[in-house]
Amino acid sequence: MIAKITFDQFLVKCPEDGLYELVNGEIVEIISTRNHIDVADYIRDSFHTQIKNLSLNYVVTSKTAIRTLTQAGVEQGRRPDVSVIDRDLWRSNRSAYAALREPIQLAVEVTSTNWDDDYIDKLDEYQRLGISEYWVVDYLGIASSKFIGNPKVPTIFVYLLDAEGNYQTTAFKGSDRIVSRTFPELTLIAEQVMNV
């Protein structure tokens, strides 16, 4: 039986050759297809352009671990495909590991075969932590029809935290312009992201 580890132990024991998450006390490697990486990079680059052009006080990265809690209180170490972080928070302790316990501004998860993690587990954990905006990018339309409808088509879900701390969601498909609270001037079209 493998001994369960804490988030702090995860930061120390996490291998440096690749990307890993702490899931239910175990270190789990994240392996992505090239298409998955292309979609995440396109979104990250689009956010970076907004930050630079509008002089916004954010940092965008794909290398940050975030401490979350499950409903049962189990520590997780999540690593969103794209993280948008308040620059002051990011720079508050620059010698620390690239890990945060505080809520970030925006998390993006690009779905893969373990899509239920993004639609169920991470959705709950990110809401519980208080992440203001969360995107689930189902560029292949692989989630259950319960989530993306029937017929199943590629969809981007944007979850926004409301005043009561609950996510409200909007789905974007095809030629829909993605509406973002964090980046109100963003002009991304859903199919642009899906067809990278």
Language model features: what each stretch is:
Residues 1-196:
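Gly/Pro/Ser/Thr-rich low-complexity, intrinsically disordered segments predominantly at protein N-termini
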